[in-house]
Amino acid sequence: MHVVVPFAADTPKTRLSEVLSPPERTALARAMLADVLSAITATGHVPTVLSTSPLSLENGCSCDDLPSTTPPGLESASDIPVTVDDRPLTAAVNAQLEAAEEPVAIVMADLALATPAALSTLFASGAADGVAIAPGRGGGTNALVVRHPDFRVDYHGASYLDHREHAAEIGAPLESVDSFRLGTDVDEPADLVEVLIHGRETAADGGESRTATRLRELGFELETTDGRVTVARDRS
């Protein structure tokens, strides 16, 4: 299986701009990417990063952000292949699907809670000529496995519904994978709560995930107000 991780290297996570500066958003995005790559490599697959611009995993992430599991067949985790495609997400991913000679998994780089177990379930899902999708909140498509040669993605709007309709049109069996961890992407400030709550459960070594650690380094902590859990930032 060819596992692809799209990554917006130039201006990541703009919807977090009200709580993070551009350099901070870049640092958080790199930490999430490293967590996702670690989870994928722990399943025994070698991921390919589909980046909008040239990206060095060794220079673009701190040493602490590099995946801890060495992918099979690679000398080090920093040797994970990077393919540059500056086209919009839909066009870039469809180019990967068109060129594929084996099943393709597309896993978004902001799935900070992804674990090897959750990904293994996704990778094993779907019919031999079908599609398996882990939907996100609000109708998005957070991860999918494509085994049908004619299936193409369209990430605009409620893409999960569009992908279901497209699969039906081409006669591809579709399986929806119900996963809290793959259904949680980090786009909005409110999403940071889940990272701080579940970050320790995500890390394979029993410590805290790189993403949660980076948030704490930036001064974010959980705060309970009127019975609701939110995040607050200490800038001192």
From Swiss-Prot:
Provide the function of this protein: Guanylyltransferase that catalyzes the activation of (2S)-2-phospholactate (2-PL) as (2S)-lactyl-2-diphospho-5'-guanosine, via the condensation of 2-PL with GTP. It is involved in the biosynthesis of coenzyme F420, a hydride carrier cofactor.
The lineage's top-level taxon is: Archaea
Q: Which GO terms describe its biological process?
A: F420-0 metabolic process
HAMAP family reported for this sequence: CofC
Q: Which SUPFAM superfamilies does the annotation name?
A: Nucleotide-diphospho-sugar transferases
> Pathway it acts in?
Cofactor biosynthesis; coenzyme F420 biosynthesis
Against InterPro entries, the record matches this protein to: CofC, Nucleotide-diphossugar_trans
PANTHER family referenced in this protein's UniProt entry, alphabetically:
2-PHOSPHO-L-LACTATE GUANYLYLTRANSFERASE (PTHR40392:SF1)
The name under which this protein is listed is 2-phospho-L-lactate guanylyltransferase
Which organism's genome codes for this protein? Natrialba magadii (strain ATCC 43099 / DSM 3394 / CCM 3739 / CIP 104546 / IAM 13178 / JCM 8861 / NBRC 102185 / NCIMB 2190 / MS3) (Natronobacterium magadii)
**Gene name?**
cofC
Name the Gene3D superfamilies on file.
Answer: 6.10.140.50, Spore Coat Polysaccharide Biosynthesis Protein SpsA, Chain A
The keyword GTP-binding belongs to this UniProt entry's keyword annotation: yes
Q: What is its EC number?
A: 2.7.7.68
Recorded GO molecular functions are:
GTP binding; phospholactate guanylyltransferase activity
Report whether Kinase shows up as a keyword of the record: no
Family designation: Belongs to the CofC family.
Catalyses which reaction(s): (2S)-2-phospholactate + GTP + H(+) = (2S)-lactyl-2-diphospho-5'-guanosine + diphosphate
Quaternary context: Homodimer.
Keyword vocabulary terms for this entry: GTP-binding, Nucleotide-binding, Nucleotidyltransferase, Transferase
First-level EC class:
transferase
